[in-house]
A protein has these predicted regions:
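Long, charge-rich, low-complexity alpha-helical segments
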Residues: 24-78
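Acidic, low-complexity/disordered tracts enriched in E/D and polar residues
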Residues: 1-37
Length: 78
C-alpha cells in the first residue's frame, strides 16, 4: 500500500518518494491518512471524526467513503 510510504510535513504537504508525487492535504485528510496508517477501520475512522467534529455519523461516513474512493483512484490503497 503506497499510503504507508507517504510522508506528511508540518504544512500538510504529503510526498510519496517512490512515485515522486506530492499532494496538499487539509487537516481532515491528514487525520484520515494517519488513522489508516494506525490500522483503523473505515468505521472506526468515521466514529473518531464524527465525535471530534460534532457532525452526524452519516455525513462523516459519506465524506470518508468519498475520500477512500479517491485514495483508490490514485492507487494509494486497494
Amino acid at each position: 500500500m503506497l499510503l504507508n510510504e507517504m510522508v506528511i510535513d508540518e504544512n500538510n504537504m504529503a510526498f510519496i518518494p517512490s512515485l515522486g508525487t506530492s499532494y496538499q492535504l487539509n487537516e481532515t485528510a491528514k487525520e484520515i491518512i494517519d488513522l489508516i496508517k494506525e490500522g483503523k477501520s473505515k468505521e472506526e475512522i468515521v466514529k473518531i471524526i464524527a465525535e471530534k467534529s460534532g457532525k452526524s455519523w452519516r455525513d462523516v461516513y459519506i465524506d470518508v467513503e468519498d475520500f477512500f474512493q479517491k485514495l483508490k483512484v490514485y492507487g494509494l490503497i486497494q
